[in-house]
Amino acid sequence: MLVASTAARPMDMIIRGCQVIIQQYRSGQTEAFYQRMLQIHLYHSGIVCLAEVDVFAMSGAVPVLVGRIDLEVDHSTILELKVCNQILPKHVQQLLRYVRARQATGMNVQHAAVICFTDSNTVIVREEDLRPPQPPAKGVVRSRFFPPPN
């Protein structure tokens, strides 16, 4: 049996879980319902998941609440769940604000996504891959320019 890389596996399970939830329960549920169902799906899949994680920024020595992450998955993925017809720029900005705040605390955020459960029984996922670009394989040169011979 082939296993996907550990970085890709949680996101694959998240998307699969959203599909199962929307097929089984359809639209018209609350954000809290979808959040809890996804949390249960991930639990049964063996993936660590925390709900409603407070996110802070520091103002000197004083912590200031930035907001609450809907789901933090596998200590590397941040999810913001919405019940609406489309993902708006403000939803993405909210997600990225949480990502920056968590990265400032030392969390290695590799993925972040806004997941939108729509009225038309579909799920829209806007995923941000936050992993740093991989260096080229050993012995591979990206580009190198040499002066012409004299």
Give the role of each language-model region:
Residues 1-27:
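Interdomain/boundary linker segments immediately adjacent to catalytic/signaling cores
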Residues 19, 54, 84:
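Histidine- and/or cysteine-centered catalytic micro-motif in compact active-site loops
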Residues 1-10, 137-150:
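Non-catalytic C-terminal interaction segments of nucleic acid-processing enzymes
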Residues 79:
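Conserved beta3 VAIK motif of the Hanks protein kinase fold
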Residues 82-136:
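Nucleic-acid nuclease catalytic cores
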Residues 23-75, 119-124, 128-133:
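Active-site metal-binding core of divalent-cation-utilizing nuclease and nuclease-like domains
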